[in-house]
Amino acid sequence: VDAPRAEHPKGRKIGIEHLGNVVGGAATEYLNVPGQFMKDCVRKILSEQGIPVWFGADCHPMMDRKNGAWATDLFEYGRVYGVDFDLDKEQRVRFADSAMNHAMAFVGVDVADDGSTTRRWRVENSWGCKIADKGYFTMDDPWFSEFVYEVAVPKSMLPKEYLDALEEPAIMLPAWDPMGALA
């Protein structure tokens, strides 16, 4: 996950009290990593293996559902209302303006000709084939940075320091913490 609040250090395991998918089963725990690390992992999986990558995001901001687009500059709310809407990711989570609320799959990535700049991501959504491009959306790279909170990648992609962190006790967050909104 990319848990953006300063009190949740990157490279540490976090858990949510009372969050589990099976009674008596293993607790749901996450490794808190920088958003760029998540992007790099997803891009590598899509580019080298061509397999979809599960992720969780706040799917509502800056979304054009009909046309299937997510972009940070899709709408100019600040210009229309004369109000500054420039909270960063940490502030949006802290003040309950953003949380993971929907799971989808990355199925493609658009890389610029320079080979290093990611422009867009192709997303398979679960809302049916009558919206967007037969159920597929396009996400710009800045939107990923701002609204994607978790990805599922194989442990084999983790550096030693992150693998070691998985062996440490988790920082436990309360049941109502936004990082537990999508289990």
PLM features: residue spans?
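Conserved catalytic-core surface of thiol
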Residues: V107, A112, S116-A183
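Histidine- and/or cysteine-centered catalytic micro-motif in compact active-site loops
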Residues: D58-H60, V109
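Flexible loop/turn segments at secondary-structure boundaries
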Residues: P61-K66, T72-D73, D113-D114, C129-A132
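Secondary-structure boundary elements
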Residues: K44-I51, A112-G115
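Active-site-proximal segments of catalytic enzyme domains
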Residues: M63, N67-D97
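Core regions of eukaryotic protease modules
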Residues: V1-E48
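Structural recognition of the beta-strand scaffold that forms the well-ordered cores
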Residues: V53-G56, A105, R122
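Short coil-to-beta-strand transition motifs
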Residues: A96-M104
